[in-house]
Amino acid sequence: MVKIGARELAAVAIGGALGAVCRYLLSGLVPQVRGFPMGTVLVNVLGSFVLGFLTWSTMLGLRLSPEVRALATVGFCGGLTTLSTMAYETVELLKASPVLSILYLTANVVLGIAAVLGGMAAAHVVWSGRA
């Protein structure tokens, strides 16, 4: 079992608050396209990219304190991305258009995975030869 200290918990809380505020702002700035909630897709893809970049960067030699790592990954990326909103919006889209709901769900999952891989590739480019 991993020991979690008060500093890591505080870091997760701060990162989560920052991520949630960013999600709220980004989701509000990005308009829906024909009922398609692009803001949620954007925050999920962005958060997936950042998480892939940070986790792969640490594997390639980037040194982050446990607090900074917790703040950035679990806190910020966790607060930025949103499974519950994606699930709700999928159900709402299903009422109007089953095809659109499937496209939305697929876009979130496929683009999220692609973003993690893209973040990992970007980290490799940034950190190759520096370790």
UniProtKB/Swiss-Prot annotation:
The chain crosses the membrane at residues 10-30, 36-56, 71-91, 99-119. Na(+) is not transported, but it plays an essential structural role and its presence is essential for fluoride channel function. Pfam families: CRCB. GO terms for biological process: cellular detoxification of fluoride. It catalyses: fluoride(in) = fluoride(out). It is a multi-pass membrane protein. It comes from the Archaea. One of its GO terms (cellular component) is plasma membrane. Keywords: Cell membrane, Ion channel, Ion transport, Membrane, Metal-binding, Sodium, Transmembrane, Transmembrane helix, Transport. Its main location: membrane. GO terms for molecular function: fluoride channel activity; metal ion binding. Na(+) binds at residues 78, 81. InterPro entries: FluC. It is found in: Cell membrane. Belongs to the fluoride channel Fluc/FEX (TC 1.A.43) family. Fluoride-specific ion channel. Important for reducing fluoride concentration in the cell, thus reducing its toxicity. This is Fluoride-specific ion channel FluC. It comes from Methanopyrus kandleri (strain AV19 / DSM 6324 / JCM 9639 / NBRC 100938). The lineage of its organism: Archaea, Methanobacteriati, Methanobacteriota, Methanomada group, Methanopyri. The gene is fluC.
